[in-house]
Design a protein with these regions (language model features):
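Carbohydrate transferase catalytic cores enriched for Leloir-type hexosyltransferases
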Residues: 1-368
Length: 368
């Protein structure tokens, strides 16, 4: 089978992680398949070369652009692919071969008020067109399957739940390595941690409000992954008015998953306050690194994390502050969460994700 994969979002956060890990497993066990990977100019050469069953094809189609429909359809036709996979909710409408599309979430539709005017309508339109065109629709969780059914009107008999996986890099790191990394990054030795984007639906305002309510003796610094925010950023202003600006630190840009694993391993508690998630990869990665997790129960988080995390509604900062305090003070509860988290995280592998995806490819070729 000659499989075309749209990899234009290779650098885009969680979707990029999905594409990269899926292709890594596919390339490692080609099983007679060939892969045509459609990439933007800046990503050419980023895939394994020697002995790889993957062929790179440059496309100039902007992500979520109108032109992507005919440019990608033409590229797929010229590459003679037997099946086309879009790893996000756009699909070239003129595509002639069987197609599979992955819908990671419909947050742009569910929380349209958090995005620029018209973004929600556009997202709904292109996602609905994509899932109607595709023979098989992949989703990360049962939560997203229900969203696809309710919001996009797709019968669930064409939808397959394919959970994401965790990279083998995410393991508990030795204390000496963690200490060295934290010193290099000028980060505190004990901290709460959040990893991910800072979009409004991530609900970081809840963490700021919870920090404000913590007793000073329990007010560990909060480390956010990525670069520092600008002083004028609404969250920076909120932290300033709450009197907790000095408690917030930033990891800076992380070079690879190994550094992220060190950041997870050093945290006293990982916190995930999201209003919605299609899966919830960062808290699962934190679990794999031996860090206890306090998470929102919204979206797919309850489904993904199960009983291995403390789950709370994403709305009451006082309740979050009390839970953060309790998890710092109660060593038995912490150890229990660590054990459960390590066990839970072992159930999610990219090999399983790839296997279920390949089964969906075969089903799509057989007519869906």
């Amino acid at each position: 089978m000659r499989i075309g994969v749209d990899a234009r979002k290779l650098r885009d956060g969680g979707i990029g992680t999905y594409i990269r890990n899926l292709l890594t497993v596919f390339f490692g066990r080609p099983e007679g398949h060939e892969y045509v990977v459609f990439l933007l100019q800046e990503d050419l050469g980023s895939l394994p070369r020697q002995g790889s069953p993957g062929e790179e094809v440059k496309v100039r189609a902007g992500k979520y652009s109108v032109s992507e429909h005919w440019l990608l359809a033409r590229a797929a036709r010229r590459a003679h692919v037997d099946l086309y996979h879009s790893p996000h909710y756009t699909l070239p409408l003129p595509i002639q071969c069987p197609a599979v599309v992955t819908v990671h979430d419909l947050i742009h539709v569910r929380f349209a008020r958090f995005f620029p005017a018209g973004a929600g309508i556009y997202a709904r339109t292109i996602a609905r067109a994509a899932v109607r065109k595709a023979r098989i629709v992949l989703v990360d969780s049962s939560h997203v399957r229900e969203d696809v059914r309710e919001i996009l009107g797709v019968s669930t008999d064409r939808v397959r739940v394919v959970p994401l996986g965790i990279s083998k890099e995410f393991t508990r790191r030795p204390a000496a390595e963690v200490e060295r990394f934290l010193k290099e990054r000028r980060l505190p030795s004990a901290y709460f941690l959040y990893v991910g984007a800072r979009k409004k639906h991530k609900n970081l305002a809840l963490l700021i409000d919870a920090l404000e309510r913590l007793p000073r003796s329990e007010r560990l610094p909060l480390v956010l992954s990525g670069p520092a925010w600008r002083p004028a950023h609404p969250l920076a202003q909120r932290a300033l008015h709450a009197g907790v600006s000095s408690c917030i630190h930033f990891s800076g840009t992380l070079n690879d998953e190994s550094e992220l694993a060190l950041l997870y391993s050093g945290a006293a508690l990982y916190v995930q306050p999201s209003l919605d998630e299609g899966f919830g990869l960062p808290p699962l990665e934190a679990m794999a690194c031996g860090t206890p997790v306090l998470s929102s129960s919204a979206g797919a988080l309850k489904e993904t994390l199960g009983e291995a995390a403390v789950l709370l509604p994403p709305s009451e900062p006082q309740i979050w502050a009390e839970a953060m305090t309790e998890l710092l003070q109660n060593s038995l509860r912490r150890e229990e969460l660590i054990r459960r988290g390590l066990a839970r995280s072992r159930g999610f592998t990219w090999e399983r994700t790839a296997q279920l995806t390949m089964e969906a490819y075969a089903e799509a070729l057989d007519g869906g």
